[in-house]
Amino acid sequence: MALGTRNMNMNLHGESKHTFNNENVSARLGGKSIAVQKPAQRAALGNISNVVRTAQAGSKKVVKKDTRQKAMTKTKATSSLHAVVGLPVEDLPTEMRSTSPDVLDAMEVDQAIEAFSQQLIALQVEDIDKDDGDNPQLCSEYAKDIYLYLRRLEVEMMVPANYLDRQETQITGRMRLILVDWLVQVHLRFHLLQETLFLTVQLIDRFLAEHSVSKGKLQLVGVTAMFIASKYEEMYPPEINDFVYITDNAYTKAQIRQMEIAMLKGLKYKLGKPLCLHFLRRNSKAAGVDAQKHTLAKYLMEITLPEYSMVQYSPSEIAAAAIYLSMTLLDPETHSSWCPKMTHYSMYSEDHLRPIVQKIVQILLRDDSASQKYSAVKTKYGSSKFMKISGIAQLDSSLLKQIAQGSNE
């Protein structure tokens, strides 16, 4: 059987008329049925395409009558299910890293962060939490300790770089890209929280890093990861029937539950890995950026999700690089350097971030067939909901090309 995965086509023509809300109440409280249009028969194994295919004239439409849900086109998935075979993770080095993918020892992380913070205290950096004492939700007294804990936790839960190459598996970086691109569309249609998408990708990488999965079961891992992430993050998560439906009944409820058990056991029930969004909010607060800069930073973080080469960087590194690049592009005259305040709160120097920033810029400027075909994130951020941020002129400027070449000094 040739390598690849089946088409998973979604009808993405037109923007959803529903506004995106943090609890996705409108998408869940009204009921669980979803109006559908049966697509034309798709070819067997190939790549997971996002190209919309029009149903043949005369094809029957099966519609569940429920006006409370927006119509959604079913998507085709692979159907084979094989046993999950666990593989031990290679021993990971514990030395300190700069932008290397190796995982740090937690004790060394604590010592490095503490020493780094003490050095910057002498610079009399502004306390961005001093005015939040009256708001108990912001936990101003504990904010610094919380983010130090998140930094330690993200290191403990990092996956090895090039983890797909370290074990016998049929999964490739391109297959991962296609899967994540499709999951971005599923996430958009289900009106889920941003955290749910980032956690979904984290769960996929952590599980694949420790278990060998056949290509025929990769999509099952993907939808199960989103099922788990939804229950972890959402107030009203999609039901298991919704995930069966979105894969065109390629997997049964029993199969998703079986994979859910396997993934939870494989992850040792540790789901709370820090996300890029957690660190971006802290960085945006420290920088005092406006909504446009914050939204652009979110877009820059999200385009890294399908990229297998970006797995080597921690969420805090990607978040810091995203806000750095966002401020550089939207405010190049006043943003001449990574100031001590941002160095303090992000815990990364400008020199540390430059290689990561250049990789993000290379993703933005890439113009190959894969980037054009699998562009769900760019399409998503081209909507008015996200300020049409993916279409701004700064993302096609000479400054961006200079940054890619490392000559933006």
Swiss-Prot record:
Keyword terms of this UniProt record: Cell cycle, Cell division, Cyclin, Mitosis
Pfam families found in the cross-reference section: Cyclin_C, Cyclin_N
Domain of life from the UniProt record: Eukaryota
Keyword Metal-binding set for record: no
Gene Ontology molecular functions: cyclin-dependent protein serine/threonine kinase regulator activity
InterPro entries: Cyclin, Cyclin-like_dom, Cyclin-like_sf, Cyclin_A/B-like, Cyclin_C-dom, Cyclin_N, Cyclins_cyclin-box
SUPFAM superfamilies listed in its UniProt record: Cyclin-like
Presence of keyword Iron: no
Biological process according to GO: cell division; mitotic cell cycle phase transition
SMART domains membership: CYCLIN, Cyclin_C
Family of the protein in this entry: Belongs to the cyclin family. Cyclin AB subfamily.
Biological role stated in the UniProt entry: Essential for the control of the cell cycle at the G2/M (mitosis) transition.
Subunit structure: Interacts with the CDK1 protein kinase to form a serine/threonine kinase holoenzyme complex also known as maturation promoting factor (MPF). The cyclin subunit imparts substrate specificity to the complex.
Name of the protein in its database record: G2/mitotic-specific cyclin-B
